[in-house]
């Protein structure tokens, strides 16, 4: 999809861009694959705020996505490419030969009318899902499982992908977009290709109101709060932090502090850590 620019008729529109949705072929979602999505405004079941900056936004319905791709041996035709308000990637509606309908994440260059399949004997072409042991070295993949049968967890957002680097015993080496090289069980599944809608990261929101439509509330700096609200708060005028390093609102070191647990079971599966920026 290409980016759409707007005439600067107001300050909010001056640098605003949006996607032209040229890839979208159908605007009404499949009713049988919809679920209600009530608003939580960042609160848990006790009504306590657990996630800041959430609230408001346009009404949404959840689209049930097939991350497992476990319907083997039955061909599926791509019926339409659709917009999903709950994720950055577009979604594709598949209609299987037996009549079942499922949504999947739409890979780049997927076209309406294409026939997809999943399983050990599927062809190596965009949109097909296979166990990693049957995917050739060098192939670009997305929607990668970490545990067999759990469903894809890695490389699911717009433009995301990973690459198969090699095979060692029961593991397959995968290079992620972060530069991390990781071993994943060869029985885990992945989908061929890169996730579509790659221009998503280039969109300029342009104005605060557009963030509110998405359900994103303002982020207030800690330095302008009172000392009872934030460790950076208080002082006369524009006071410095007054601490050795920046702190989160709960008094924990942040901005550069590593938060990964020291001895995590999956550490032994990471061959090379992610690249430092």
From Swiss-Prot:
Pfam family, one: Ribosomal_L2_C
GO molecular function: rRNA binding; structural constituent of ribosome; transferase activity
Keyword Transmembrane helix on entry: no
Gene3D superfamilies noted in UniProt: 2.30.30.30, Nucleic acid-binding proteins, Ribosomal protein L2, domain 3
Region (Disordered): 36-55, 213-277
Gene Ontology CC annotation, any one: large ribosomal subunit
UniProt superkingdom: Bacteria
Disulfide linkage: none
Gene Ontology annotations of biological process type: cytoplasmic translation
Protein keywords: Ribonucleoprotein, Ribosomal protein, RNA-binding, rRNA-binding
InterPro entries assigned to the protein according to its UniProt record, in alphabetical order: NA-bd_OB-fold, Rib_uL2_dom2, Ribosomal_uL2, Ribosomal_uL2_bac/org-type, Ribosomal_uL2_C, Ribosomal_uL2_CS, Ribosomal_uL2_dom3, Ribosomal_uL2_RNA-bd_dom
Self-association state and partner proteins as the record states: Part of the 50S ribosomal subunit. Forms a bridge to the 30S subunit in the 70S ribosome.
PANTHER family referenced in this protein's UniProt entry, alphabetically: LARGE RIBOSOMAL SUBUNIT PROTEIN UL2M, RIBOSOMAL PROTEIN L2
NCBIfam families: rplB_bact (TIGR01171)
Function: One of the primary rRNA binding proteins. Required for association of the 30S and 50S subunits to form the 70S ribosome, for tRNA binding and peptide bond formation. It has been suggested to have peptidyltransferase activity; this is somewhat controversial. Makes several contacts with the 16S rRNA in the 70S ribosome.
Family in the record: Belongs to the universal ribosomal protein uL2 family.
Protein name: Large ribosomal subunit protein uL2
Organism: Staphylococcus saprophyticus subsp. saprophyticus (strain ATCC 15305 / DSM 20229 / NCIMB 8711 / NCTC 7292 / S-41)
Lineage: Bacteria, Bacillati, Bacillota, Bacilli, Bacillales
């Amino acid at each position: 999809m290409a980016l759409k620019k707007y005439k600067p008729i107001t300050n909010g529109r001056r640098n605003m861009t949006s996607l032209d949705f040229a890839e979208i072929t159908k605007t009404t979602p499949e009713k049988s694959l919809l679920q209600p999505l009530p608003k939580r405004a960042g609160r848990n079941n006790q009504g306590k705020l657990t996630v800041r900056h959430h609230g408001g936004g346009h009404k949404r319905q959840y689209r049930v996505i097939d991350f497992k791709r476990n319907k083997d041996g039955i061909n599926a035709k791509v019926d339409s490419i659709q917009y999903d308000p709950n994720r950055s990637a577009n979604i594709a509606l598949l209609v299987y030969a037996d009549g079942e309908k499922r949504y999947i994440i739409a890979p780049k260059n997927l076209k309406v009318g294409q026939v997809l399949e999943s399983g050990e004997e599927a062809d190596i072409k965009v949109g097909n899902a296979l166990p990693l042991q049957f995917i050739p070295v060098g192939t670009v993949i997305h929607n990668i499982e970490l545990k067999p049968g759990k469903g894809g967890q890695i490389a699911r957002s717009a433009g995301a992908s990973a690459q198969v680097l090699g095979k060692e015993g029961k593991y397959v080496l995968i290079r992620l977009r972060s530069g991390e090289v990781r071993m994943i069980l060869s029985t885990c599944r992945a989908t061929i290709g890169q996730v579509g809608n790659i221009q998503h990261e280039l969109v300029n929101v342009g104005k605060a109101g557009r963030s509110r439509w998405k359900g994103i509330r303002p982020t207030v700096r800690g330095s302008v709060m009172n000392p009872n609200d934030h460790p950076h708060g208080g002082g006369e005028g524009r006071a410095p932090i007054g601490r050795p390093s920046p702190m989160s609102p709960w008094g924990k070191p942040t901005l550069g502090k590593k938060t990964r647990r020291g001895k995590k079971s999956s550490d032994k599966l990471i061959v090379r850590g992610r690249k430092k920026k």
